[in-house]
Regions:
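Generic signature of intrinsically disordered, low-complexity, basic-rich segments
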Residues: 2-3, 37
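Short hydrophobic alpha-helical segments enriched in small aliphatic residues
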Residues: 3, 9-12
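Intrinsically disordered, low-complexity regions enriched in Ser/Pro/Gly/Gln/His and often acidic
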Residues: 5-6, 112
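Composition-driven detection of intrinsically disordered, low-complexity segments
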Residues: 7, 15-18
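Nucleic acid-binding interface residues in structured DNA/RNA-binding domains
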Residues: 18-121
């Protein structure tokens, strides 16, 4: 997390405030950590929740570098068609599939049913 300095002039006095500025990756990790057990989200959905629907690729890049897969369940993120990630960074497609199945999510031909399992957060 980065910090910034904000100066406010009030009644002729300068008041300095230190503010925390969250990086895009930190926003992504925070949102992904909220996806509940037994649910999935799409890259575009996470991007939109970060403030820009065009950040879907950035979401993928951030999750590929996930610093804490136990707390940030990147395996719960799929593409806009519900398809699993071919290049899942933490063991490949089979591991992602197994993790989702262990949460009760049906995976058929490498896809999940978004109507049934998509998080509406």
């Amino acid at each position: 997390m980065n910090v910034g300095l904000v100066a406010i002039v009030e009644n002729g006095q300068v008041i300095l405030n230190i503010i925390k500025i969250m990086t895009l990756n930190e926003k992504i990790y925070k949102i992904v950590s909220k996806i509940p057990y037994g649910k999935v989200a799409t890259y575009g959905q996470i991007a939109t929740l970060c403030g820009n629907p065009y950040y879907a690729r950035a979401v993928g890049n951030a999750l590929h570098k996930n610093p804490n897969p136990q707390k940030i369940p990147c395996y719960r993120v799929v593409n806009s068609n519900g398809k699993l990630t071919e290049n899942f960074a933490f063991g490949g497609l089979r591991v992602q599939s197994d993790l989702l199945i262990s949460e009760g999510i049906e995976v058929i031909d490498g896809k999940v049913d978004l109507e049934k399992y998509q998080w509406r957060g």
